[in-house]
Amino acid sequence: MANYDVLKVDGTKSGSVELSDAVFAIEPNNNVLFEAINLQRASLRQGTHAVKNRSAVRGGGRKPWRQKGTGRARQGTIRAPQWRGGGIVFGPTPRSYSYKMPKKMRRLALRSALSFKVQEKGLTVVDALNLDAPKTKEFKTVLSNLEQPKKVLVVTESEDVNVALSARNIPGVQVTTAQGLNVLDITSADSVVITESAAKKVEEVLG
């Protein structure tokens, strides 16, 4: 167990919290991180690419000329692949690029990503993010007080509408919950701001 400073929204220290080394201080497994990031990126692909093969192209039902006697090569349809406007051979078809990863590997990837952020001094623990109403200006002030870079991932224990709406119009700032935490979001951000309760929940799930 290691102690981490807990900050208030004004940037001052309010105390400290003990977090498990098994979640926030392991040696990052780069191979598993690589696989987890590839998996997420593959799942984000639309996979809607499509072309028409010779059966899908319109027309070509009639034989263009008779089989013999013209001196030309025999042809059965003007929609065969060798014709201009004909069907495509072995073209892309709609498909899903997503695949699965074992649960243990997914959790190891998350622990590795969090530990990597801790090693980079890119993890900030705050006591709470209590906003009375969605205020972008107020939330920008909070991030400024916490001395955060432009690309920030904000993690709350559960869905917080005020925080989500406040951060929505700030470029580079993304909000997620402890349950929705994922490797791609963590590694894409320059810094992770996590509430104390969210950190405990992540520790409970991954520990």
Swiss-Prot record:
Xref: SUPFAM superfamilies: Ribosomal protein L4 (SSF52166)
GO cellular component, one term: ribosome
GO MF entries: rRNA binding; structural constituent of ribosome
Region (Disordered): 53-76
Biased composition (Basic residues): 60-71
Family classification: Belongs to the universal ribosomal protein uL4 family.
Function: One of the primary rRNA binding proteins, this protein initially binds near the 5'-end of the 23S rRNA. It is important during the early stages of 50S assembly. It makes multiple contacts with different domains of the 23S rRNA in the assembled 50S subunit and ribosome. Forms part of the polypeptide exit tunnel.
Protein known as: Large ribosomal subunit protein uL4
